[in-house]
Regions:
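Functional cores that coordinate and move charged inorganic groups
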Residues: 197-204, 213-293, 298-301
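Extended substrate/RNA-proximal surfaces in nucleic-acid metabolism proteins
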Residues: 25-30, 77-211
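Low-complexity, acidic/Ser/Thr- and charged residue-rich accessory regions of DNA metabolism proteins
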Residues: 358, 364-456
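Cys/His-rich short segments
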Residues: 280-342
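Active-site neighborhood of phospho(di)ester-bond hydrolases with catalytic His/Asp-centered motifs
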Residues: 33-35, 66-70, 106-109, 178-180, ...
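An N-terminally biased module of ancient metal coordination in phosphate/nucleic-acid-related enzymes
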Residues: 8-12, 17-113, 118-121, 418-419, ...
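Active-site environment of divalent metal-dependent phosphoester hydrolases
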Residues: 40-42, 68-77, 114, 135, ...
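Histidine/acidic-residue-rich catalytic or RNA/ligand-binding cores of hydrolases
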Residues: 43-46, 77-81, 187-194, 225, ...
Length: 456
């Protein structure tokens, strides 16, 4: 993948993107945006998740734009108002105490809707983008009728998806709403347990206001390209982060080339699928996601879609129903073969968080250990931020800052020359960078070397 003046492009990532010379866009800047995160008022979120900490680590990560998340929560909205200052003519905000920090904020939130549809209970998460705090307040005034906004940063609302869209659009047609993490088994539009089979089925006559779809960690653009009915929607990628740590924040993101960041430029680029402005998404390998394969965590069983189908989606150990993975769910809805790419598709690149790359190369269990931080800090201080390291820095230049094995690991990730043991049933996938045989060994361990035919 080429951005700016690099010459290391090769392998899958390089082939998935057209060669791009940053100098051919002399009046533009690269804007990397993570539009779906959470505040400390959301469940299972770091209590240190403040505006200042989000901005601090967004800069280190290389994010130019980050969503506020959770503007529906009264206490978080108050903190947004107190800690951010509006940037004129942008529809975006900066940190009031440090406006020189090169990080913009967009007012965003995620809501959960629970409703009945054809005698089934549907549970769908949606991301909402707004052009300013005033509009966010108007949205809150409408949504408070459907649920307790103070109960959670991501509130649960008792209304169906079409009426949610109607409420959002009645406030302003500048607002944007799209389904969150579209394929996860629970709380998603295509989820195996409480989702739909199409966007039209979910949003009904309000589908005309839906222009995008968030892929989530367990799927990537090629998986979504297999559904022809998704061609009209722009695929976006965000972290859904509940932490400011750089192995969570910005682990997936959207890359734009703009003269200046602005709400309208970003939203219009998404709505129009403008490939001149919306260049590509940053994705983790979908196998890294927690729900890529079908499986049962308690029994350490992880299965490909083919093997799960052979077993009737029943755990071969305990005989209980398996958690259907995203790979299998895509297979159920796909009407195209793997490898198909629509002609107007936004490009993508597979990456992993730099901390994860370093930890994997060092064979340590956590990206938070001091040894990883020491290398991470040296690289980001030298090259400016994490994305500069992952996307731009040459192997030779990195080798002057850290040992060659780390530099080689980063290049392999950049060029999509790694393997990942698939995640399943809430368990993250395991990246394999150097040991070519490790994936097969670990997959065998996860299915406990069972002979699947014994259970058919």
């Amino acid at each position: 993948m080429c951005v700016k003046r690099t010459d290391y492009c090769s392998s899958k990532n390089a082939n998935s993107l057209k060669q791009q010379n940053y100098e051919s866009y002399p009046k533009t800047m690269r804007v990397i945006a993570d539009l779906h995160i959470h505040s400390r008022y959301s469940r299972a979120t770091s209590q240190k998740m403040s505006i200042e900490e989000i901005a601090r680590f967004a800069r280190i990560k290389g994010l130019n734009l980050v969503g506020t998340g959770d503007f529906t929560h009264p206490k978080w909205l108050k903190e947004i108002q107190e800690n951010l200052t509006f940037e004129p003519d942008t529809g975006l905000y900066k940190v009031a105490k440090n406006p020189e920090l090169p990080v913009y904020f967009m007012t965003t939130t995620e809501v959960s809707t629970i409703f009945n549809f054809e005698n089934d209970t549907k549970k769908i998460h949606h991301v909402i983008l707004t052009p300013n705090i005033e509009t966010a307040i108007q949205i809150n005034d409408r949504l408070v009728k459907y649920g307790d906004l103070a109960s959670d940063g991501r509130p649960t609302l008792n209304l169906d998806a079409p009426h949610l869209v109607e409420e959002i659009m009645q406030v302003s047609h500048e607002n944007m709403i799209f389904p969150a993490h579209a394929w996860t088994p629970w709380f998603s539009i295509f989820g195996a347990f409480s989702g739909f089979n199409s966007i039209k089925e979910c949003y009904q006559d309000m589908t005309r206001h839906i222009h995008a779809l968030e892929t989530g960690l367990s799927s990537d653009p090629p998986m979504n390209w297999r559904l022809s009915k998704l061609d009209k929607f722009t695929l976006v990628s965000n972290s859904d982060s509940h932490s400011f740590w750089p192995w969570r924040l910005g682990r997936e993101a959207n890359v734009f080339y703009l003269e200046k960041p602005s709400y309208r430029e970003i939203v219009n680029a998404i709505r129009l699928k403008d490939k001149e402005k919306f260049k590509f998404t940053i994705e983790t390998d979908p196998s890294y996601g927690k729900y890529h394969w079908t499986g049962h965590r308690n029994c350490h069983v992880a299965l490909s879609s083919q093997d799960a189908i052979k077993l009737g989606n029943v755990c071969p150990v305990c005989r209980r129903k398996l958690t259907k993975g995203v790979e299998q769910r895509v297979e159920e809805l796909a009407d195209r073969p793997a490898g198909f790419k629509p002609k107007d598709a936004i490009d993508f690149v597979h990456l992993l968080p730099l901390s994860e790359v370093i930890a994997t190369a060092l064979n340590v269990n956590s990206p938070s250990v001091q040894q990883v931080w020491n290398i991470y800090n040296r690289l980001t201080e030298k090259f400016g931020n994490e994305y500069n390291v992952l996307l731009d820095a040459s192997k030779e230049a990195m080798s002057h800052v850290t040992d060659e094995k780390i530099a080689e690991a980063i290049v392999r990730v950049r060029e999509d020359r790694i393997k990942v043991v698939p995640g399943y049933d809430g368990v993250y996938g395991q990246p394999i960078i150097f040991d070519e045989s490790a994936k097969e060994k670990l997959v065998s361990q996860r299915v406990q070397q069972l002979n699947l035919t014994d259970f058919m």
